[in-house]
Curated annotation (Swiss-Prot):
Protein name: Acetylglutamate kinase
Catalytic reactions on record: N-acetyl-L-glutamate + ATP = N-acetyl-L-glutamyl 5-phosphate + ADP
Compartments where found: Cytoplasm
Pathway: Amino-acid biosynthesis; L-arginine biosynthesis; N(2)-acetyl-L-ornithine from L-glutamate: step 2/4
Family the UniProt entry places it in: Belongs to the acetylglutamate kinase family. ArgB subfamily.
Pfam families, per the entry: AA_kinase (PF00696)
InterPro entries: AceGlu_kinase-like_sf (IPR036393), AcgluKinase_fam (IPR004662), ArgB (IPR037528), Asp/Glu/Uridylate_kinase (IPR001048), Glu/AcGlu_kinase (IPR001057), NAGK-C (IPR041727)
GO molecular function, one term: ATP binding
Organism: Streptomyces avermitilis (strain ATCC 31267 / DSM 46492 / JCM 5070 / NBRC 14893 / NCIMB 12804 / NRRL 8165 / MA-4680)
Marked site positions, Transition state stabilizer: K36, K254
One Gene Ontology term, aspect cellular component: cytoplasm
Enzyme Commission number, as recorded: 2.7.2.8
Biological process (GO), any one: arginine biosynthetic process via ornithine
Length: 304
C-alpha cells in the first residue's frame, strides 16, 4: 500500500502530456494529412524508425496519413553503381531511359518497400503503390525553359492529373498509403520521374487534405539566409509568393508545393526539420511548431 501515492505521483506527468494533446486530437480527428518523406531522414536508421512511429501514431490518433516519397540519395547511389552519370539541369535530374529503369527500381522496389516494412512493424497498415497504379498520378513530359530555350531532360514528368480513388479506398479500409513519385503519361505511354514535393502537394490538394507536411534537412524557411538563421514560423500564400524568386534552388519545389496546396483547398502546409526525431508529432500535437507554416491568404488568423 505504501507504494500507491508514489506510483500515482510518478505517472501524473505522463497523463498531463497526453491531456495537453487533447485539443489537437479533437481538431485533427478524421482529417487527411499528406507527408512528404525525404532528406536525411531517408538515410538515417533512427530517423527512419522515428518517422514510421510518428505516422503510425497519427493513424491510431484518428488522422489519415498518406506518405509520398522520393529517393534522391538512393537514386544517385544506384545510378553510380550502374555506371550511369547523373546530370542536373535547372535543378532537375536528367533522366535517360536507362536511368528511368533505375529510378523506378529504386523508388518502387527499394525505398517504398523499406518504408512499408518499417510501418508494418506496427501492424498490417501500410500499402505501397506508385503514381502509375490506378492512374493515381498522370504526367506529361516536362521541358523546362533555360535562357529562353526549352531543354530536354528526358523522362522527367509534369503532373497533369490526379486520381485519388485508390488512395481513398485504402484510407477507407484503415490503411496507410505509401506513394512513390512515378507517373505514366497518357500521351506516349512512357513512365516519368516526377518531383516528390510537387507530387505530395498535388495529392494533398486532390484529396482535400487538411495538412501538407514536407520533411527537409533545414529548420524551415529562413528569414534572410545566409545572413540570418532566423526561421519564419508562419506566412501567407502571398508573402511566400514574393519570397520564391530569392529562395535556394532546393527549397523552390518544396515551397512551390506548399503554395499550390494552400491555394487549392489545403488548410495549412508546413515545412519541418526531418533531422529532429518525432518532428511530425511536435508539429501536429503541440503549439511549439518547429518549422514554417504556410496558410491561405483569406484564412490568415483562422488556420491552425
Amino acid at each position: 500500500m505504501s507504494h500507491g501515492p508514489t506510483r500515482k505521483h510518478t505517472a501524473l506527468p505522463k497523463a498531463q502530456i497526453l491531456i495537453e494533446a487533447l485539443p489537437w486530437l479533437t481538431r485533427h480527428n478524421g482529417k487527411t494529412v499528406v507527408v512528404k518523406f525525404g532528406g536525411n531522414a531517408m538515410i538515417d536508421e533512427e530517423l527512419k524508425a522515428a518517422f514510421a512511429q510518428d505516422i503510425v501514431f497519427l493513424h491510431h490518433a484518428g488522422l489519415k496519413p498518406v506518405v509520398v516519397h522520393g529517393g534522391g540519395p538512393q537514386i544517385s547511389a544506384a545510378l553510380d553503381r550502374h555506371g550511369i552519370v547523373s546530370e542536373f539541369k535547372a535543378g532537375l535530374r536528367v533522366t535517360t531511359e536507362d536511368a528511368m529503369d533505375v529510378v523506378r527500381m529504386v523508388l518502387a522496389g527499394q525505398v517504398q518497400r523499406e518504408l512499408v516494412g518499417l510501418l508494418n512493424q506496427h501492424g498490417p497498415l501500410a500499402v505501397g503503390l506508385t503514381g502509375e497504379d490506378a492512374h493515381t498520378i498522370t504526367a506529361t513530359k516536362h521541358q523546362p525553359e533555360i535562357d529562353g530555350e526549352l531543354v530536354d531532360i528526358g523522362r522527367v514528368g509534369e503532373i497533369t492529373e490526379i486520381d485519388t480513388g485508390a488512395i481513398e479506398a485504402l484510407l477507407a479500409d484503415g490503411r496507410i498509403p505509401v506513394v512513390s513519385s512515378i507517373a505514366r503519361s497518357q500521351d506516349d505511354g512512357h513512365v516519368y520521374n516526377v518531383n516528390a514535393d510537387t507530387a505530395a502537394a498535388a495529392l494533398a490538394a486532390a484529396l482535400g487534405a487538411e495538412t501538407l507536411m514536407v520533411l527537409t534537412d533545414v529548420e524551415g524557411l529562413y528569414e534572410d539566409w545566409p545572413d540570418s538563421d532566423e526561421v519564419i514560423s508562419r506566412l501567407t500564400a502571398s508573402e511566400l509568393e514574393k519570397l520564391l524568386p530569392e529562395l535556394a534552388s532546393g527549397m523552390v519545389p518544396k515551397m512551390e508545393g506548399c503554395l499550390h496546396a494552400v491555394r487549392n483547398g489545403v488548410t495549412t502546409a508546413r515545412v519541418i526539420d526531418g533531422r529532429v526525431q518525432h518532428s511530425i508529432l511536435l508539429e501536429i500535437f503541440t503549439d511549439e511548431g518547429i518549422g514554417t507554416m504556410v496558410v491561405p491568404d483569406e484564412e490568415e488568423g483562422d488556420a491552425v
